[in-house]
């Protein structure tokens, strides 16, 4: 199964984002795969 590219929805598929991406809940919106932010 293909991974989910950047800015595409990942609702109910939190583990399916492509490498380097993470599922993020946008405010007043749905969950999308976004580039992982460095944890500082």
Curated annotation (Swiss-Prot):
Effect seen on changing residue 26 to A: Loss of ability to inhibit rASIC1a at low concentration and gain of function as a positive modulator at high concentrations (>100 nM), probably by stabilizing the open state of the channel
Disulfide bond annotation, renumbered to this chain: 3-18, 10-23, 17-33
Effect of residue 29 to A: Does not significantly modify the ability to inhibit rASIC1a channel
Signal peptide extent: none
Documented effect of changing residue 14 to A: No change in ability to inhibit rASIC1a channel
Keywords of the record: Disulfide bond, Ion channel impairing toxin, Knottin, Pharmaceutical, Proton-gated sodium channel impairing toxin, Secreted, Toxin
The keyword Disulfide bond is assigned to this record: yes
Outcome following mutation: residue 34 to A: 1.4-fold decrease in ability to inhibit rASIC1a channel
Impact upon substituting residue 24 to A: 170-fold decrease in ability to inhibit rASIC1a channel
Top-level division of the source organism's lineage: Eukaryota
GO terms assigned for molecular function: ion channel regulator activity; toxin activity
Effect recorded for residue 31 to A: 2.2-fold decrease in ability to inhibit rASIC1a channel
Family: Belongs to the psalmotoxin-1 family.
Function statement: This toxin is a gating modifier that acts principally as an inhibitor on ASIC1a (ASIC isoform 2) and a potentiator on ASIC1b (ASIC isoform 3). This toxin potently and selectively inhibits rat, mouse and human ASIC1a (IC(50)=0.35-3.7 nM). The blockade is rapidly reversible. The toxin acts by shifting its steady-state desensitization to more alkaline pH (0.27 pH unit). At higher concentrations, it potentiates rat and human ASIC1b and activates chicken ASIC1 by stabilizing the open state of these subtypes.
Name the record gives this protein: Psalmotoxin-1
Source species: Psalmopoeus cambridgei
